[in-house]
Amino acid sequence: CMGYDIHCTDRLPCCFGLECVKTSGYWWYKKTYCRRKS
């Protein structure tokens, strides 16, 4: 469930234990995705 194409919402069980991050890249501007908490 991790990747730039994943819309991170609290309803997604696969995002449990992960952090939601807003991208700042050009192609994925302000799109959210899940990643492991650093």
Curated annotation (Swiss-Prot):
Q: GO terms for CC?
A: extracellular region
Q: Where found, per UniProt? A: Secreted
Q: Which UniProt keywords are listed?
A: Amidation, Disulfide bond, Ion channel impairing toxin, Knottin, Neurotoxin, Secreted, Toxin, Voltage-gated sodium channel impairing toxin
Q: Any idea which residues bear Serine amide here?
A: S38
What Pfam family does this protein match (any one)?
Answer: Toxin_22
Expression tissues: Expressed by the venom gland.
Query: Which InterPro entries does UniProt cross-reference here?
Result: Toxin_22
Q: Where are the transmembrane segments?
A: none
Q: Which cysteines are joined by disulfide bonds?
A: C1-C15, C8-C20, C14-C34
- State the remark under miscellaneous: Negative results: has no effect on lepidopteran larvae when injected at 20 pmol/g, or on mice when injected intracranially at 32.8 nmol/g.
Q: What is this protein called?
A: Mu-hexatoxin-Mg1b
